[in-house]
Amino acid sequence: EGKTLTEVLPVVENLLAHSKLYIGLSTLDNLVKGGRISRAKGVVSSFLNMRVVMELKNAELIPVIKGRGNKTFLKWFEGFKEELKQTPNLKRIGISYAGETEQLKLFRDELQELFPEVMITFFHTTPVISTHTGSGAFAIMYYSE
């Protein structure tokens, strides 16, 4: 409050340097509609029941894992928990979702059990984001010092 841009900018840069964001998509239909992927890729991924998890890195979404069905998310989550265990000074975890929450509540509960001292925020994403991602999408982000 009352800070100048030159005072705030280093704080924001530090926050970005110590944060990670992963996005999981259950369907690529909305990415096809938005022109982000081709119609052919969308049809194939829908037919094969593809799921994808991506990491936001330097303003780009980098695929981390692709697979068929919800087992893809479970496999990714196991590796994600290990990543968090190796992260020093973990401060906060956020889980955002569009639509279905059952699996994500289990993720949240497992993370809270592993990291009881870390605040975990669990919230529905904004309509703008859910329009682009479609139902069943989620984001998990964390911040460390």
Label each residue range with its predicted role.
Residues 1-133, 137-145:
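Mixed-charge interfacial surface used for oligomerization/domain docking
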